[in-house]
Amino acid sequence: MSQLVECVPNFSEGKNQEVIDAISGAITQTPGCVLLDVDAGPSTNRTVYTFVGPPECVVEGALNAARVASRLIDMSRHQGEHPRMGALDVCPFIPVRGVSVDECVLCAQAFGQRLAEELDVPVYLYGEAARMDSRRTLPAIRAGEYEALPKKLQQADWAPDFGPSSFVPSWGATATGARKFLIAFNINLLGTKEQAHRIALNLREQGRGKDQPGRLKKVQGIGWYLDEKNLAQVSTNLLDFEVTALHTVYEETCREAQELSLPVVGSQLVGLVPLKALLDAAAFYCEKENLFILEEEQRIRLVVSRLGLDSLCPFSPKERIIEYLVPERGPERGLGSKSLRAFVGEVGARSAAPGGGSVAAAAAAMGAALGSMVGLMTYGRRQFQSLDTTMRRLIPPFREASAKLTTLVDADAEAFTAYLEAMRLPKNTPEEKDRRTAALQEGLRRAVSVPLTLAETVASLWPALQELARCGNLACRSDLQVAAKALEMGVFGAYFNVLINLRDITDEAFKDQIHHRVSSLLQEAKTQAALVLDCLETRQE
């Protein structure tokens, strides 16, 4: 799964459409960047852009946009209702998929340093990227706004993190940083504004003040009345949905409303939402209601129903979930997303990757998928009704393993490519030689870890496959037989890929440990596959 970072730069121009479009163009023309939204405000004279992409791409996209802004925006003439201090006022980086906040901090640091060096402007780090507590919040950095910068920059306490401590009239200053994804989530009530606000005060982290904190961490909240819909809302901002989830806010609001004898009539998501936030809610309701729902589309539909996300307007996942708006990979990348014909063609081409490691991962992924298939061919049928509970338990591990193993098809090829890149590093000086040696050793360890992960993943499936062989739909006997051999073959391939990469690793203790482990996994695969085949051969109709 590719990494995805959201970038939300705020530029101090909301009236001149040519400038707004030029900045949009700079972002969309950056390879790897997908522009999701452009929100221009004439009264604030400010435009908020939302775009996503891999970490290195969004940094380039933000820089390209800033270059255009430096030519077209003159802060000495800027007027607007929104607080501001620079042509590019603020530029946060936000993790969406496969990226940590710490990695987004690195994005902010790289962007801030390059922006300051190229445009010779002052840049401050805020949020999770802040280097001192006094700069964690944007209002603290922006205090006094653009007009205060000439004197502020002369103070030692306000020396920028990057760039000169001098006033640049046409630009001002920029703040960049990292934060978690913010979700705006409103719950609908048939009640009054005051009742909604009472609930918000009980729930939001701030509560009613220091002496009366609320129950939900990382949640802001207020109550208001939506005249056009003739209902009240508990309006919340989830500052970290992994600390307090969507379903937690909804369920707690329902509990508060019940105590006030108020009906909750659905909810509303404002803006875009990460897929994980909805899948976490789906997992909660599946467990709470003992539901067996495997497909992502159906799990999203469940959440839309349980939270009433379509109560005020249609909720289209394809238009509201960030990951659905962004292609997983470019057309030239992603073995796992290619057709079978294209994948086989690449394997057969005159290149070292994809090779045996990717083929082993693909075989194991298909073996796990066959296990899932047999489980589903058993589940929900009247003649196997007594096995429904068992199948509910057995099917998910196969589906999860199949998805994980599919990612290893690409991971193996990428590990090999990274090793080749290390091979090409210069080795003219002692320092370069040391750097190259370290990179080669790291590349070899990565090349070992991928097939080892494959073998470990398959090992976790043998108990489930044994049980499926004993009680699964016998009409699928041959499918389970193929599954057993495909999984064994995957481990077989992993074993030899580990060995060939261990050969040049210099850490002997590491080599011995990994060799012993992968040998054990191969022997286990041979034994377990044979047991599955024997069980299937002896089973009677």
UniProtKB/Swiss-Prot annotation:
Q: Where, per UniProt, does this protein localize? A: Cytoplasm, Cytosol; Golgi apparatus; Cytoplasm, Cytoskeleton, Microtubule organizing center, Centrosome, Centriole
The region called Formiminotransferase N-subdomain is annotated at: 1-181
Q: Its catalytic activity? A: 5-formimidoyltetrahydrofolate + L-glutamate = N-formimidoyl-L-glutamate + (6S)-5,6,7,8-tetrahydrofolate; 5-formimidoyltetrahydrofolate + 2 H(+) = (6R)-5,10-methenyltetrahydrofolate + NH4(+)
Q: Where is this region: Cyclodeaminase/cyclohydrolase?
A: 335-541
Keywords for this protein: Cytoplasm, Cytoskeleton, Disease variant, Folate-binding, Golgi apparatus, Histidine metabolism, Lyase, Multifunctional enzyme, Phosphoprotein, Transferase
Q: What is the effect of changing residue 299 to P?
A: In FIGLU-URIA; mild phenotype; decreased glutamate formimidoyltransferase activity; 57% wild-type activity
Q: Where is this region: Linker?
A: 327-334
Which InterPro entries does the protein's record reference? Cyclodeamin/CycHdrlase, Formiminotransferase_C, Formiminotransferase_C_sf, Formiminotransferase_cat, Formiminotransferase_N, Formiminotransferase_N_sf, FormiminoTrfase_cat_dom_sf, Formintransfe-cycloase-like_sf
Q: Which GO terms describe its molecular function?
A: folic acid binding; formimidoyltetrahydrofolate cyclodeaminase activity; glutamate formimidoyltransferase activity; microtubule binding
Q: Does the keyword Signal apply?
A: no
The segment annotated Formiminotransferase C-subdomain runs over 182-326
Q: Please describe, based on the UniProt annotation, the reported consequence of changing residue 135 to C.
A: In FIGLU-URIA; mild phenotype; decreased glutamate formimidoyltransferase activity; 61% of wild-type activity
Q: What is its EC number?
A: 2.1.2.5, 4.3.1.4
Disulfide bonds, which pairs?
none
A single GO BP term for this record reads: L-histidine catabolic process to glutamate and formamide
- Any one Gene Ontology cellular component term annotated for this protein: endoplasmic reticulum
Q: Which residues form the active site?
A: 82 (for formimidoyltransferase activity), 412 (for cyclodeaminase activity)
What Pfam families does this protein map onto?
Answer: FTCD, FTCD_C, FTCD_N
Q: In which pathway does it act?
A: Amino-acid degradation; L-histidine degradation into L-glutamate; L-glutamate from N-formimidoyl-L-glutamate (transferase route): step 1/1
- Function noted in UniProt: Folate-dependent enzyme, that displays both transferase and deaminase activity. Serves to channel one-carbon units from formiminoglutamate to the folate pool.
Q: Read off the PANTHER family from this record.
A: FORMIMIDOYLTRANSFERASE-CYCLODEAMINASE, FORMIMINOTRANSFERASE-CYCLODEAMINASE
UniProt lists the family membership as follows:
In the C-terminal section; belongs to the cyclodeaminase/cyclohydrolase family.
Question: What disease does the Swiss-Prot or TrEMBL record associate with this chain?
Answer: Glutamate formiminotransferase deficiency: Autosomal recessive disorder. Features of a severe phenotype, include elevated levels of formiminoglutamate (FIGLU) in the urine in response to histidine administration, megaloblastic anemia, and intellectual disability. Features of a mild phenotype include high urinary excretion of FIGLU in the absence of histidine administration, mild developmental delay, and no hematological abnormalities.
Subunit structure, per the record?
Homooctamer, including four polyglutamate binding sites. The subunits are arranged as a tetramer of dimers, and form a planar ring-shaped structure.
**The protein's name in its UniProt record:** Formimidoyltransferase-cyclodeaminase
Q: Which organism is it from?
A: Homo sapiens (Human)
**Organism phylogeny:** Eukaryota, Metazoa, Chordata, Craniata, Vertebrata
